[in-house]
């Protein structure tokens, strides 16, 4: 009886261990199923081991006599020799507490190692960082304000003027400019705050279009267009530009050149070059009805009177009457030029 009891106890313990072994394999199977694509071979081995263990358990329950063989087969076929190469098998119940403690101890060691590594990294980082700047602070760039005078003139381009020295630089600079004597009370006040506005104005001046340089060939086309249109007082800038057919030429440029040309044509003719012995004030005369009168441009206070010369002898009186009826222009050609003597 004692033999049977001892045999029953061994059989029940072995069956219990086999059930625990199957449960551990099932837990591992659940873990591996998450990584089914990455670990297909492991999953297949675990499933085969679980099936073989269950098969042996069912056979051993039917045949009580072969319990020793079942235990040996289950341990050999399902045994951990195959799985110890892949992963450690987790035993349940009694050994679970020990494994949990071991895992907690490993986790604490890992945490302490990570903290130590983090402290080392922080210390290395603090050593590598430079806490002060060796280079001195840059000096502030103090730009003096610039003053630009604004004048109302007809010129298209105004050059920059040099800065005038001022007594107080901190006070705002205000420059008031009066335009011309014709305007009574109108004045323009221009205040420039700093170098920023000066740079903007300088950039705007540099971005301006360069003035047109009228070459002799371009001026010749201009004169040819004026001749076709009937003169400078009749032609318009747009018509002149269309006739000239020059790339890049604008109406404003043609208009400016036309105004200059009109002013040039209105000027009187330049006086004849004088020698050293002549009077520095050139005397100009004009003829009116056969009488010579000095022009208004002369600044001399003398009075001139014509001195008649002896006319040529004519044969008939009809020629005299015809000659007297001629215009001053024709009479000046036929008669002798009278000599002028200054009267004081």
From Swiss-Prot:
Residue ranges with Polar residues bias: 310-319
Gene Ontology, cellular component aspect: nucleus
Comp. bias regions, Acidic residues: 97-106
Annotated region (Disordered), positions in chain: 90-122, 156-212, 306-344
Main location: nucleus
Domain HTH myb-type: 206-266
DNA-binding stretch(es), residue numbering of this chain: 237-262
Annotated Gene3D superfamilies: Homeodomain-like (1.10.10.60)
BP GO terms, sorted: cellular response to hypoxia; cellular response to phosphate starvation; regulation of DNA-templated transcription
Purpose: Probable transcription factor involved in phosphate signaling in roots.
Entry protein name: Transcription factor HHO3
Species: Arabidopsis thaliana (Mouse-ear cress)
């Amino acid at each position: 009886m004692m033999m049977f009891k001892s045999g029953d106890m061994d059989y029940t313990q072995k069956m219990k261990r086999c059930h625990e072994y199957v449960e551990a394999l099932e837990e591992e199977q659940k873990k591996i199923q998450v990584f089914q694509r990455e670990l297909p071979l492991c999953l297949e081995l675990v499933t085969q081991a679980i099936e073989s263990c269950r098969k042996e358990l069912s056979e051993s329950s039917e045949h009580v006599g072969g319990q020793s063989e079942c235990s040996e087969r289950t341990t050999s076929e399902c045994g951990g020799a195959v799985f110890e190469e892949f992963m450690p098998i987790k035993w349940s119940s009694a050994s679970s507490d020990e494994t949990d403690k071991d895992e907690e101890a490993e986790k604490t060691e890992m945490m302490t190692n990570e903290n130590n590594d983090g402290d080392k990294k922080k210390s290395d980082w603090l050593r590598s960082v430079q806490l002060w700047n060796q280079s001195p602070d840059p000096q502030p760039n103090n730009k003096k304000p610039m003053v630009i005078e604004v004048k109302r003139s007809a010129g298209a381009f105004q050059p920059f003027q040099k800065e005038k020295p001022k007594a107080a630089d901190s006070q705002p600079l205000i420059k008031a400019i009066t335009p011309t004597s014709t305007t009574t009370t109108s004045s323009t006040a221009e205040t420039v705050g700093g170098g920023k506005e000066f740079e903007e104005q300088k950039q705007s001046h540099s971005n301006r279009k360069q003035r047109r340089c009228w070459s002799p060939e371009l001026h010749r086309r201009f004169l040819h267009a004026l001749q076709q249109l009937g003169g400078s007082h009749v032609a318009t800038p747009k018509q002149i530009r269309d006739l000239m057919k020059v790339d890049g030429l604008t109406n404003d440029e043609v208009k400016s050149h036309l105004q200059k040309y009109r002013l040039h044509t209105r000027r009187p003719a330049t006086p004849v070059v004088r020698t050293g012995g002549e009077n520095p004030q050139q005397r100009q005369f004009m003829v009116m009805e056969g009488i010579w009168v000095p022009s208004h441009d002369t600044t001399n206070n003398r009075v001139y009177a014509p001195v008649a010369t002896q006319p040529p002898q004519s044969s008939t009186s009809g020629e005299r009457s015809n000659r007297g009826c001629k215009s001053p222009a024709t009479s000046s050609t036929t008669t002798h030029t009278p000599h002028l003597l200054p009267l004081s």
